[in-house]
Amino acid sequence: MSPNAMPQDSQANVDIMSVITRGTSWQWMLLLGLALLGVAQAAATLAYQTYVGLGIAGYQAPVFWAVYIVTFVFWIGIGHAGTLISAILFLFRAKWRNAINRSAEAMTVFAVLTAALFPLIHIGRLWKFYFLIPYPNQRGLWVNFKSPLLWDVFAVNTYMTISIVFFFVGLIPDFAIARDRTTGIRKFIYTILALGWQGKSGQWKAHNRTVLHLSGLATPLVLSVHSVVSWDFAMSIVPGWHATIFAPYFVAGAVFGGFAMVMVVMIPVRRIYGLEEYITDYHLENMSRFILFTSNICGYAYAMEYFIAWYSGVEFEQTSFWLRAFGPYWISTWCMIVFNVIFPQLLWFKKLRTNIPFLFVLCFFINIGMWFERYVIIITSLSREFIPAAWGLYIPSLAELSVLTGSFCWFSMFFLLFLKGGPIIAMVEVKELIIHEKAHGGAH
């Protein structure tokens, strides 16, 4: 974008704050209503499940990790793109991240909050959740550190804590701008959230130092958290799971699906609120390149899984992967391959990388494909283990599908509320970019 096309830095405050200050549209109210309805029906399902038991969730031998665990892994993965954009690209000084990092950070926090529900849902007895916390107690019981469920508790809570702190610290200067441009109860709330920010040089030094340290802390978390989640499976001897490739495979898939979800969220927001001057085609094209890159990594991992199963000569592994492609779950497997590997290859063409409707549709299907990837990994391996007499056919129950739908509504509810409560674009960072671009006459 040329400097002449850039808005004035003062205009950036007006444009971005207008998303918050303008009245709520009927479209926003409709979407929020649908999201609340979805959350309500999922809550009703969970209440009934808690009363009756996990039997209504379709759990039956040999599949006792099902849609709830699939969806947990999916949402944890979605949360990784925000940290990648905000932390890793910040450390690499990639300026194009400035316009999209806030949306990505918000998505990260809300995705992790969604994922955190599923270990609790999976244990069935919600009121016993504190048994997962290692603390001295009169019962003489201690947590089982060999349990993948406990690994997930530590991974999710660590990642959620860092993500929320990182998200909030970045919002402080923008809360101060919102404080000075609103009145009434909104001004009161923003005043509290701004923590006395006045934009003094000392505050900026402390803020920049904090963001830098949090970025350095969050970067290894991107790699470690989903690696820990992948070890839920890789540490077992179940055919199709016991593989050393799982950690990098899961991390690449998480970034891939996370970037696709950022696009699905950002493209409508950009269009509806007229933010094309800030979230430009240049940003979307750069994200498309990341999606293409991580898609190819996932494709390589898929191919290597099948190759190693063949090369190993282990009959159980070969049978497991044969059944994935041609067994009762073949539709899920081929949806995964087509949506995650074949369709993204169209991004080699620049015309398609800059075609906004195409990007939205593609990223929507990528997220479907990434959910199917987790479904294929978990369900197919558990339903066809070592003993043929113990094989079974798993079919998701209505209760699981209800909670799955509710998780997307839960995520959407948070994001819609944030649209009207917090700046969806980091105003301070965008203004820095505008000033820098006008001074140097270069694209960002």
Roles of regions detected by a PLM:
Residues 103-110, 276-299, 358-369, 431-439:
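Interfacial and helix-entry/exit segments of alpha-helical transmembrane bundles
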Residues 1-78, 412-416, 443-444:
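N-terminal signal-anchor module of multipass membrane proteins
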Residues 81-93, 159-176, 261-271, 341-357, ...:
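Transmembrane alpha-helical segments in integral membrane proteins
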Residues 63-127:
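Membrane helical hairpin/interfacial module
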